[in-house]
C-alpha cells in the first residue's frame, strides 16, 4: 500500500485571475475575487449575497493574481513538468475557465514581446535550450497540432485542415489519432512555424465577451525522443510526450452571444466553423452547445476520478476526454490552470470554475518513464542513417580503388630500374597507401568529408579523362569513320554512366545529411563555461521555486495547526471569559455551518440547472428524432428502409452508427460486377418487345421499351367571316348577346363520326398554304365589329 501511494501523484491545480477589462470598468462592475498568493487561496464574494453571508474560500497549489507575470507561472509551475518530459515522462498542461478569462493568453500569450510569451513558446525555448546543453545524447523532436471542433478532430497543419480524422485505440500504445501529421523540428524557429501555421486555420470567432474567442479545443503535441548510451554499452531510448491544451471557454448564450457588429465572426478550419458576421449567429449556438457538452463530459470524468465510490470513468462521452485519458488518472503528470474573471457579472461562472478546479485536486495519476518503446522514430532514424552511411563509405572506397588503379598505371610506367614490373609494383604501391592510411586515420566527421571530396575529385578526373579521349579520337585521322563513331559512342556511354553514378551519389549524400541534421546532438558548438553558468542559474531558479512552494505549504499547515491549538487551550480565568471565548467559537462554527448550507444549496441549484439543460437537450434530440421518423415513414419505401437497417452497425471505438459496405471487404474489388439478367449479352437492358422484334427481323434500335409512337394530326387554322347586323335601333346588349351566340354555335359544330389518326401538320401529305398578309388582315377585320354604336 505504501508503494502504491508513493507511485501516485496528485494532479497539480493553480488558479490565475485576469485584471478588469475596460469594458467592465466602464459598465461599473466591481471586483469580487481576492487572491492570497502566499497562502495559495482564492476568496470569492457573492455580490448578491444576503447580509452576514461569508465569502467562499478555495485553496490550490499556487495562485497568481492580476499582477503576475508569464515567466512566474512558467518557472514555478510548468518548468518542472517540462523537465520531467525531457526525462521520458508524459506531461499535460491545460487551461480551463469561462470564455474571455485569458486561457489562450496563458497558453500562447503574445509572441512578439518576450515578457508576454505564454506556456507554449516558453516550453519551446526550454526544450531546445536543454538539448543544446546536454552531453552525449541524441534527440528527435516532433510536433503535431490538432483541434476538436464540434466533436470532430481536425489536423491544423495538414494540407486538408477540414478533413475529419478518426480516433483509434491500441492496447499497447493507448489512444491515438489515425493519419495525424507530425513534423520533425530542429530548432525553435521551425516549431514556432508549425504553431503559427496551425493558428491560421484554427476556428475562432467574435462574441460579446471576447473579440477573438476560441471555438474549438486545440492540442499542441510535442514528442521528445532521447537516445543515450547506458552502462551496458547499448543505446537506450526515452520518449516523453507533452500535451499543451487550450480549451474553449464554457459560456452561456445570453452572455456570450454572437457579436454581429464585429465584422467577420469566424475563421473556420477548412469547410467548418461558420460564415461571416451574418452567419455567425446561426453557428454560435451550435458551437457553444458542443463546447459545453465536451466540458461537461470533462467535468463528469473529473468528478468520477475524484470520488472513491465510482467504478466507471466515462472517458468515451467525448473526444476530448478520450484524448486526455492518460492525463486524467493515467500515467502522465498533469497541471490544470483555472482562469478566472474578477468582475461581479461573472460570479456564477467563476464559482463553477473554482469548484471544478477544487474537485480536480483529488485526482491521482501514476506517472512512469517511457523507456525503450517499440515504435520510436529515433531508432528508425538511427538505423536508416547507419545504412546510408555504409552505402556512402562503400561508394567512397570504390572510388578510392578506382583512383588507385589509375595512379598505379602512372607509377608502373615510370618505375625505377631494379624493380619488377607489372602487378608487383601495383601491389607494393597499394600496400604502401594502405599503411599510410592506417597510420593517419582521420576522425569520423573528417573521414566523411574526405570520402565526399575523394569521390568528387575522382568523378571530375574521370570526366576530364573521357573528354580528352573523345577529343583525341576525333582528332585521330588514321581511324575509319565507322570505328571513330563506335569509339565515340562507347565514350559517350561511359560518360553518361559516370553522370548517373554522380547523381546517385549526390542524392544518397543529400539524404544522409538531411536525416542526420534532424537528429539533435547536445553539446556541439556550445561553450562549456556558458553551459555551466546557465545550468547553475537553472538550478538556482528551480530551488527558489521549490522553496516558495514549501513555504506556501508550511503556512497553510501552520494555519490549520493554529486553529487546532486554539481549540485545545481551555484555561480560563473566569466564567465570563469562558463564555466570551465559547460564544466567539460558537459564532465561528455557526458561520461555518451557514457556509456549508449555502454550499449545499448552491450545489443543489447547480444540479437543477444542469438537469434542466440536459432535459432541454434531450427534448431537442427527441424532436429531431420524431421529424426524421416522420420523413422515413412517409417518403422512404419499407423495402428500402429494411435494406438500410440491415446494413447499420455500431462502431464502439467512435460511438457512431455506420453502414456496412455493399461489397464485402474480402471479395476481389478488381473483379468486374456481373450485369443484370435482363441484359445478358447486350450493352444495355432490352425489353421483351424489342427481343421479339429482333427475332422477327425488324430493326430494334430505338425500341428499348414497349412504347407506341403515334403521329399527331393538327387541322389547319380555319378562317371564317361573321355577319353582324347594322341595325342602329337595336339594343346594344341584345346585339352583343347575338354575337356571342353565333360564336358559340360555330365553336360547337358537330365533329365527324369518323375517327382519324392524329397527324401533325408537318407530317400531313398536303400542307395548308401559309396565310398571306392580305388574308390575315381580312380575317382580323372580319373578327372586329364593323358597326359603331351611337348612343346620342
UniProtKB/Swiss-Prot annotation:
GO terms for cellular component: cytoplasm; mitotic spindle; nucleus; spindle microtubule. It is found in: Cytoplasm, Cytoskeleton. InterPro entries: Kinesin-like_fam, Kinesin_motor_CS, Kinesin_motor_dom, Kinesin_motor_dom_sf, P-loop_NTPase. Residues 10-363 form the Kinesin motor domain. Residues 257-268, 773-792 have a biased composition (Low complexity). ATP binds at residues 97-104. Residues 249-287, 397-418, 749-792 are annotated as: Disordered. Residues 374-627 form a coiled coil. GO terms for molecular function: ATP binding; microtubule binding; plus-end-directed microtubule motor activity. Residues 628-792 are annotated as: Globular. Residues 269-282 have a biased composition (Gly residues). GO terms for biological process: microtubule-based movement; mitotic spindle assembly; spindle elongation. Heterodimer of KIF3A and KIF3C. Microtubule-based anterograde translocator for membranous organelles. This is Kinesin-like protein KIF3C. The gene is KIF3C.
Amino acid at each position: 500500500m505504501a508503494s502504491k501511494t508513493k507511485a501516485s501523484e496528485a494532479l497539480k491545480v493553480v488558479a490565475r485571475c485576469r485584471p478588469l477589462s475596460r469594458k467592465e470598468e466602464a459598465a461599473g462592475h466591481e471586483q469580487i475575487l481576492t487572491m492570497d498568493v502566499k497562502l495559495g487561496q482564492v476568496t470569492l464574494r457573492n455580490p448578491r449575497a444576503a447580509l452576514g453571508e461569508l465569502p467562499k474560500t478555495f485553496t490550490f497549489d499556487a495562485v497568481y493574481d492580476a499582477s503576475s507575470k508569464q515567466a512566474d507561472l512558467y518557472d514555478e509551475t510548468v518548468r518542472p513538468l517540462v523537465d520531467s518530459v525531457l526525462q521520458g515522462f508524459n506531461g499535460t498542461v491545460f487551461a480551463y475557465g469561462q470564455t474571455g478569462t485569458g486561457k489562450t493568453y496563458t497558453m500562447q500569450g503574445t509572441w512578439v514581446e518576450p515578457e508576454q510569451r505564454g506556456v507554449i513558446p516558453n516550453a519551446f525555448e526550454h526544450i531546445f535550450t536543454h538539448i543544446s546543453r546536454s552531453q552525449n545524447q541524441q534527440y528527435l523532436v516532433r510536433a503535431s497540432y490538432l483541434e476538436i471542433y464540434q466533436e470532430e478532430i481536425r489536423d491544423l497543419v495538414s494540407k486538408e485542415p477540414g478533413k475529419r480524422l478518426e480516433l483509434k485505440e491500441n492496447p499497447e500504445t493507448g489512444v491515438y489519432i489515425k493519419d495525424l501529421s507530425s513534423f520533425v523540428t530542429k530548432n525553435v524557429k521551425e516549431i514556432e512555424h508549425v504553431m503559427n501555421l496551425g493558428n491560421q486555420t484554427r476556428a475562432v470567432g467574435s462574441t460579446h465577451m471576447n473579440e477573438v474567442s476560441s471555438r474549438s479545443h486545440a492540442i499542441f503535441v510535442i514528442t521528445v525522443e532521447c537516445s543515450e548510451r547506458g552502462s551496458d554499452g547499448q543505446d537506450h531510448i526515452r520518449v516523453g510526450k507533452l500535451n499543451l491544451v487550450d480549451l474553449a471557454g464554457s459560456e452561456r448564450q445570453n452572455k456570450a452571444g454572437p457579436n454581429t457588429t464585429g465584422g467577420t465572426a469566424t475563421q473556420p478550419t477548412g469547410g467548418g466553423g461558420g460564415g461571416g458576421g451574418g452567419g455567425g449567429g446561426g453557428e454560435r449556438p451550435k458551437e457553444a452547445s458542443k463546447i459545453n457538452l465536451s466540458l461537461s463530459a470533462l467535468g463528469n470524468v473529473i468528478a468520477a476520478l475524484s470520488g472513491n465510490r465510482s467504478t466507471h470513468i466515462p472517458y468515451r462521452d467525448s473526444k476530448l476526454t478520450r484524448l486526455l485519458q492518460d492525463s486524467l488518472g493515467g500515467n502522465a503528470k498533469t497541471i490544470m490552470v483555472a482562469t478566472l474573471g474578477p468582475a461581479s457579472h461573472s460570479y456564477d461562472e467563476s464559482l463553477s470554475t473554482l469548484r471544478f478546479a477544487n474537485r480536480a485536486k483529488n485526482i491521482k495519476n501514476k506517472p512512469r518513464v517511457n523507456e525503450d518503446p517499440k515504435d520510436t522514430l529515433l531508432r528508425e532514424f538511427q538505423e536508416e542513417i547507419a545504412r546510408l552511411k555504409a552505402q556512402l563509405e562503400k561508394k567512397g572506397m570504390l572510388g578510392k580503388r578506382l583512383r588507385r588503379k589509375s595512379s598505379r598505371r602512372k607509377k608502373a610506367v615510370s618505375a625505377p630500374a631494379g624493380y619488377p614490373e607489372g602487378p608487383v609494383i601495383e601491389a607494393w604501391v597499394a600496400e604502401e597507401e594502405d599503411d599510410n592510411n592506417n597510420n593517419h586515420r582521420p576522425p569520423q566527421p573528417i573521414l566523411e568529408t574526405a570520402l565526399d571530396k575523394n569521390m568528387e575529385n575522382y568523378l571530375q578526373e574521370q570526366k576530364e579523362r573521357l573528354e580528352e579521349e573523345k577529343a583525341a579520337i576525333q582528332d585521330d585521322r588514321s581511324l575509319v569513320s565507322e570505328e571513330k563513331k563506335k569509339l565515340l559512342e562507347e565514350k559517350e556511354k561511359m560518360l553518361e554512366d559516370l553522370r548517373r553514378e554522380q547523381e546517385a551519389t549526390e542524392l544518397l549524400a543529400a539524404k544522409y545529411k538531411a536525416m542526420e541534421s534532424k537528429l539533435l546532438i547536445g553539446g556541439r558548438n556550445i561553450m562549456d563555461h556558458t553551459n555551466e553558468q546557465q545550468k547553475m542559474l537553472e538550478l538556482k531558479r528551480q530551488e527558489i521555486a521549490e522553496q516558495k512552494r514549501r513555504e506556501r505549504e508550511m503556512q497553510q499547515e501552520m494555519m490549520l495547526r493554529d486553529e487546532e491549538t486554539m481549540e485545545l487551550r481551555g484555561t480560563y480565568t473566569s466564567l465570563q471569559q469562558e463564555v466570551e471565548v465559547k460564544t466567539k467559537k460558537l459564532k465561528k462554527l455557526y458561520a461555518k455551518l451557514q457556509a456549508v448550507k449555502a454550499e449545499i444549496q448552491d450545489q443543489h441549484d447547480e444540479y437543477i440547472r444542469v438537469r434542466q439543460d440536459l432535459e432541454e437537450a434531450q427534448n431537442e434530440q427527441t424532436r429531431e428524432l420524431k421529424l426524421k421518423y416522420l420523413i422515413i415513414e412517409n417518403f422512404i419505401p419499407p423495402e428500402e428502409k429494411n435494406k438500410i437497417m440491415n446494413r447499420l452497425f455500431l462502431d464502439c471505438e467512435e460511438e457512431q452508427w455506420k453502414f456496412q459496405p455493399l461489397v464485402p471487404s474480402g471479395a476481389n474489388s478488381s473483379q468486374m460486377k456481373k450485369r443484370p439478367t435482363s441484359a445478358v449479352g447486350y450493352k444495355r437492358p432490352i425489353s421483351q418487345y424489342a427481343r421479339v422484334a429482333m427475332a422477327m427481323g425488324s430493326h430494334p434500335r430505338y425500341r428499348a421499351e414497349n412504347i407506341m409512337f403515334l403521329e399527331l394530326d393538327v387541322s389547319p387554322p380555319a378562317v371564317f367571316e361573321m355577319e353582324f347586323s347594322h341595325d342602329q335601333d337595336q339594343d346594344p346588349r341584345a346585339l352583343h348577346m347575338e354575337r356571342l351566340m353565333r360564336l358559340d354555335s360555330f365553336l360547337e359544330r358537330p365533329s365527324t363520326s369518323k375517327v382519324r389518326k392524329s397527324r401533325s401538320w408537318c407530317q400531313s401529305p398536303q400542307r395548308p398554304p401559309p396565310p398571306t398578309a392580305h388574308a390575315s388582315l381580312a380575317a382580323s377585320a372580319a373578327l372586329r365589329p364593323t358597326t359603331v354604336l351611337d348612343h346620342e
